[in-house]
Amino acid sequence: MRKLTVFEMCITAFFAALTAVLTQIAIPIGPVPITLGTFSVFLAGALLGAKLGAVSQAIYVLLGIIGVPVFSSFRAGVGVLFGPTGGYIAGYILAAGLVGFLVKRYGNKFYVIILAMLAGYCAYTFTGTCWYMYSMETGVAEALMVCVVPFIPGDVLKIILAVVLVRRLNPVLQKYLK
């Protein structure tokens, strides 16, 4: 197994911190707030690749579990993961890994990045909505109306902005990432 470079460690930590900061920019609209955290998840996956992207989000989740107030509204602790938003938080790891895998596999083309981010969006939305249904004991229709539909416009905007940034930043970062 290859050792990580100092740059790879730093950029991975940076994306964990970026997710923590952007998650605090939230619009509370019910049990699942609108945050900019997913913007960072998309960027981490597409820019760092599957492994480092997923690791950056795993660091974010682990920081929250051990008590660092990184989750939305400065919450922390394992209890947050067992609450209604826990599936979305855990889904960040899956989404970043999936986005990174798809971009690496199919290239840094505009349409590939969009499709990869849509796949990541579907992955974390699926895990989050399933967990919400379980933890809140609701049905599919109610969960979709509470957890998915209100977020679609904002998530589409985040994906568009992330794609633009990735297209600009990827050529620069790839010089330093192996």
Identify the function of each model-found stretch.
Residues 6-15, 37, 55-56, 87, ...:
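Alpha-helical transmembrane segments of integral membrane proteins
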Residues 23-33, 61-95:
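Interfacial aromatic-anchored transmembrane helix boundaries in multi-pass membrane proteins
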Residues 14, 21, 78-122:
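Short helix-perturbing small/polar motifs within transmembrane alpha-helices
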Residues 5, 50-55, 106-112, 139-140:
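Membrane-helix interface segments
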Residues 1-13, 146-178:
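Alpha-helical transmembrane segments and their cytosolic interface
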Residues 13, 17, 21, 43, ...:
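Generic alpha-helical transmembrane segments of integral inner-membrane proteins
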Residues 1-54:
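Hydrophobic transmembrane alpha-helices
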Residues 68-74, 131-145:
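Interfacial helix-loop-helix junctions of multi-pass membrane proteins
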